Amino acid sequence: MHKLGMRNLLLLPLTLALAACAVGPDYRAPVLPESAALVRAESELVTAEAVERDFWRGFDDPLLTELVEEAFDANHDLRIALARHDRSLALLRQSRRDLAPSVTAQAGAAHQRVSSDQMPQATRSQRDYESYDAGIAALWELDFFGRVRRAVEAQQAEAEASAADLRAMQVVVVGELVEQYVRLRGLQEQLRVAQANADNQRESLALVDARLEAGRGTEFDSVRARAQLESTLARIPALEGEIAAITHRLAVLTGREPGALIARLEKPTPMPALHDQVAVGLPGELLRRRPDIAAAERRLHAATASIGVATADLYPRFTLNGLLGTQAASTGDLFGRDSETRLVALGVDWSFLDSGRVRARMAAADADAEANLARYEQTVLQALEEAETALARYTQSLREREHLEAAAEASAEAARQARVRFAVGVVDFLEVIDAERSRLEAEDGLAQSNVRAATALVGLYRALAGGWEERMEAPRQATAEPALSST
């Protein structure tokens, strides 16, 4: 009868466990908005085709591609994000272990001598006791109301959010690297323009000085020519300083010391070529592709599951304890048949007298979920805003560049004609100075416009989260183990 009662005691919680459900709300992902196209998508500049992978390869710059690959391998921000993702996966594995019994092995040996006051008639040897024991103990929380399962669900969502954070960091790092590289090439072009204009102005100064010596010029023209040359030369140190700073930044982005890339980057190369058309895809694809949206959605899932964890504390918590071992007064008898010990116990822990605290935790969890929902919705709107803004900036930068190209070409021709006309005495030197100043401003403006257009294109790809899909598969997956159901 005793054995039958114990068996029923054990079968009851096991039966309840099989029929258990997880309390708290079941998560349902918010529906993403579906738009036909981006508002700023002009047909001559963009297409609705899928965003290209590895967009930086489209610039046709082997050195840029090498630097991006090196950043993927060694960038410290990416290493930090990867370590955080590994940590979240470790916590997920730990939480999943809570679904199974916790089993420990234990052993001990003790020697005790009882006081002669307690046993006045016993000899010393009779007052000495030894005890030896060994066994295996198990503790299992019977998850009747889904507290453990909801905790695992929340941790899995957090792990998936950390994977999205890693992908977001890839977007940030590669986007910054490409932008800095484009700025470097633009600054080198500005430096070339300044040096070329300085050379032209030296020639003009030499011409003025020659006319002065021949008695056909004025000291005033010579002074103005020298002032213009010095003004142009003054631009060069600032440009060289910015070039050095960006070179150092690119080295750090690839995980190196600041001076490591000087030799590879000091030789100027043309600005990366811009695309005639950019594939931007559809807004719905953009929202599904953005890692920051994925991270926000996963954290909303985690916050929703945490409501279930808090709600489960309203109900009793059942634990099943078991012990199987041996205990004897000597090591020789430790594994004898009569030394066997066992224990099976069912425990109940119920904080119904403290329900006020539990309900306060539930309210806090619910508020946290509401905050995460608002954060998710805000992230979606920001993603659309960034894409629209980046597309508008790229479109306008191309139009600006078109006008500046024409201005630079015209100002170069005007400067050439002004020097010819001055040489034959048709105009005074003031016309030459004005023409050369206009040429410098136009060519420098064109170089800056090329940088703005290229960085706007990179910003567009960052907003679209394009070019990183293949890289996104590399991080360790939170779903390496089967997902848990919460029925």
What are these model-predicted stretches?
Residues 79-80, 96-97, 142-170, 220, ...:
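Sec/SRP-type N-terminal targeting helices
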Residues 212-216, 422-426, 463-467:
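A short glycine-centered flexible hinge/capping loop motif at secondary-structure junctions
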Residues 2-13, 18-73, 132, 156, ...:
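Terminal intrinsically disordered/low-complexity segments used for targeting and assembly
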Residues 68, 133-137, 181, 283, ...:
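Membrane-embedded beta-strand positions in outer-membrane beta-barrel channels/transporters
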